[in-house]
Design a protein with these regions (language model features):
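Active-site flanking residues adjacent to catalytic metal/cofactor-binding acidic residues
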Residues: 13, 125, 153
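Conserved cofactor-binding/catalytic machinery of classical short-chain dehydrogenase/reductase
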Residues: 83, 129, 133
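Anionic group-transfer/hydrolysis microenvironments
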Residues: 16, 128, 156
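Switch II (G3) loop of P-loop NTPases
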Residues: 122-129
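Active-site beta-alpha connecting loops in nucleotide-dependent enzymes
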Residues: 108-110, 132-169
């Protein structure tokens, strides 16, 4: 990953990534870091709330505090939104404008897509089509689930048939 930063003037790095130290050490870029778990980062997510249909948190850093409400559930969305917001700021987008864009962001159909049911359970569609992808989505759902997770998945189409037994195990 650190090869991405060898020629960059600016670098936005997830401080919680196991490769963060190597990426920071291997760059001459101006580095901005972000984290959910570590206070040593330039920006941190505080008071993270994983809800069935969204994620909320406070972004704190460089004398700025902003409340983020993102209609894409899961902890991975916190990381993705922090990285996107900081990259936008590096490109000159004002902090409050970048926050507003995150609030308006919608997920992609078929990727952790919440289906309204007006019931006491939540239905989520995700187009995970590999063993790793299925494992990641189920891990993300475990973070926000308040009960059982029932998983129905298919392996149709022209996808690699050798993945199917691994996905079912």
């Amino acid at each position: 990953k650190h090869k991405l930063f060898e020629q960059a003037e600016q670098a936005v790095i997830n401080f919680d990534d196991s490769s963060a130290a190597a990426m920071i050490e291997g760059t001459k870029s101006v580095v901005t870091t972000y984290s959910i778990r570590q206070d040593g980062a330039d920006f941190t997510a505080k008071n993270v709330r994983d809800l069935p249909d969204c994620v909320e948190y406070e972004l704190v850093g460089s004398g700025m505090i902003g409340r983020v409400h993102l209609g894409i559930p899961g902890h991975f969305s916190v990381y993705n939104s922090m990285g996107a917001l900081l990259c936008a700021m590096k490109a000159g987008v004002p902090f409050q404008q970048a926050l507003g864009a995150l609030r308006a962001a919608k997920g992609v159909k078929g990727r952790i897509e919440v289906v309204p049911t007006n019931t006491d359970y939540t239905v989520i569609i995700d187009y995970a089509h590999s063993p790793d992808g299925l494992e990641n989505i189920l891990s993300s759902l475990r973070e926000i689930a308040h009960g059982r997770i029932l998983c129905v998945f298919g392996c149709g189409g022209d996808r690699d048939r050798t993945k199917r037994p691994k996905m079912g195990s």
